[in-house]
Structures are given as C-alpha cells and as structure tokens.
C-alpha cells in the first residue's frame, strides 16, 4: 500500500486521538429547531437560520416558482452568459437595502471573502486582521500574498501601532462584524476612524449580523450608523436570509473593480437565477421581520438570565451566537454528547476553529425557537455542570 495512504491514516488517527476529528450528522427534516437524526428527534441549537426563514413556506414557494420560470442553473459564469436580469434586480435591491451605491452577488460567503481581498491588495501591500476573523478572511489574505499583520482580538491600540508602522502603499483592515465563535460585535466606528487616519480600506464581514442587527435587519454598519466610501461590506445570504450566497457592497467604482478582478466571481458558474428571485422575497421578509427580531432578542436575554454556570463560561454576547466556553477538547465533546443524550443538539467547537484551551459549545438561537426550548437548554446545562463539577 502507498506511503501516501499510510500517512493519511496516521494523520486521521492523530486527529481522532486529539478529539479533533469531525463527524457529519444527517438531518432528515427541513432546517428548523426540530431535527430528525438517525431516526431520533432532536431539538437543535446549531443553525445560523437566525430569523427562521430557511423553511418559511412563502420562501419555499417562491423558490419553486422561480425554478419553474428560470430553470435549475445559470449555465455559465456571470461574465459569459450566466448573468440574468434577476441577478441585476437582486444586486440593486441589496445595495439599496444596506445603503450602498452598488452590490455584487457571490455564490457563497467564503468565495466572497476569498476573492475580495486578493482583488484589493497584493505583494507589498499590508492587511491588518483581527486574530479571531473567520477562516475565509484568513484564506483571502493568504491568497493575496500581501503582508498580514494580525492584532489581538479587539485590541485597537495594537492595531493603531501596526498601521502607524506600515509603509505599504495600500492598506486593508479586515474584520468580522459579529465574531462567529464568540458572538461579540467589532468596534466598527473605531475601526473606521483608524482606517481614515491611516488611509486604509475597511472590509467588514457581516455574515452573522445581516438580517439581525440594525434597523429592519440592515446589518452591523446600519446598527452603528456608519457609511463611508472606504467601507467594503460583505453580507451573507444563507444565514438570516435563509437562502444561499453572499454579496459585497460599497462605492460604485470599488464594486466595479471587484467585478473585474475578484477571481472567485469571474471563474465560477453563476448562482442559479432562481436563488436570486427567492432572495428578493427574502429581503422583503427581513425588512418586515421586526417581530421575529424582537422575539429573538427576548430569547437571548432569557437564556443568559437562566444560566447559573460557575465553572463553564457564557461569553458576553447580544447576538444569537451564545458560546459556552468549556476548556478542554474532550470535556467539550463530553458535554455535547451528554446534551445529545438528552435530545439537545449543540455542537462542540474545538481547535483550530477556536484557540487551544478554549473549546466550547456554540449555541445558536433563532426566532423559530420558543422560550420553552431555550429554558430547557439552559436548565440542562446548569444541571450537567453541577453534576460534572459540583
């Protein structure tokens, strides 16, 4: 047998031995708090479907009707023949929704981030990145071959020193808006002030804020009251929006440059036009979802108030991402298994997704959960911690 396969087997065994080997679970029901896994009914706190739109009947109907009208696929890349009138309509609607001059629709959030950064910076340029940024931003920086300066999470003093010490012709600050494993919100106004002071772009990945934060769910920049030509806003359309894809929004010339230079936009088949049509309805639903956002905010508050943890730590978060830091990989996995045995599906997040020694449960609350759901989870966590640590 090949030494290549032997090496793979050894590496896979090592992952398992460190508690780092990932396992997929197959859900036999549509995306909702109630799941069916291996024939067992579970109450799930896993998805990023923050407004409960993924299985919204009106949205499913719109997608089915759009598929009948547009067919199943686009047939080509956007810059050949895979760009349709409904893609234009979606981009205009997205730009207006977030208050930008123009928007560009990408197939996924990962592709947006991996394409935008290399389109803006390259060798000899400098990128300044929060250490807890999403992997797609990290990969975008690596692909760009620009010099990467990572600053400790939220440490603006270090960032300011890094910016002041850089002689790069082009500078780019990149940050999550809502950090995906911590749930906290970046200090966007302060970051923009630093970007202005040092003549840098500021790229904000609002994967977990779009649809949830700000007036009518218009996102983290709207929540902070920020608009500026140097802002590059990235929103995800497969989380709160309930469908699929992502978009970049900003100054018109910036977006035109991305259209010309973002390789993950140029060299891939365009997203099906039916998805774009469904997303037009999704934006209407987001805009009208104040009741859902109010309900979700209430669940977040109720969950925090009900927890009485002393050893495990709930990280402070006003967003639907409610992390419970456990510590070691094996203990986090054991807690997730204990919850699973009680019919509660909560993922254990381990390195390299989070720093070593900070393995955690990533609780995701959605507007489709009930107060009873949230209380059940909180009380079970309280009981499990007491049983484990007294």
From Swiss-Prot:
CDD domains from the UniProt entry = KBL_like
Positions contributing to pyridoxal 5'-phosphate binding: 109-110, 180, 208, 236
Q: Which reaction does it catalyse?
A: 6-carboxyhexanoyl-[ACP] + L-alanine + H(+) = (8S)-8-amino-7-oxononanoate + holo-[ACP] + CO2
Q: What class of enzyme is it?
A: transferase
What Pfam families has UniProt attached to this entry?
Aminotran_1_2
Its pathway, per UniProt, is: Cofactor biosynthesis; biotin biosynthesis
Q: Does the keyword Transferase apply?
A: yes
Q: Which GO terms describe its biological process?
A: biotin biosynthetic process
Instruction: Give the sites modified to N6-(pyridoxal phosphate)lysine.
Output: 239
Outline the subunit composition: Homodimer.
Q: Which family does it belong to?
A: Belongs to the class-II pyridoxal-phosphate-dependent aminotransferase family. BioF subfamily.
Described purpose of this protein according to its UniProt entry = Catalyzes the decarboxylative condensation of pimeloyl-[acyl-carrier protein] and L-alanine to produce 8-amino-7-oxononanoate (AON), [acyl-carrier protein], and carbon dioxide.
Record-given protein name: 8-amino-7-oxononanoate synthase
- Record organism: Azoarcus sp. (strain BH72)
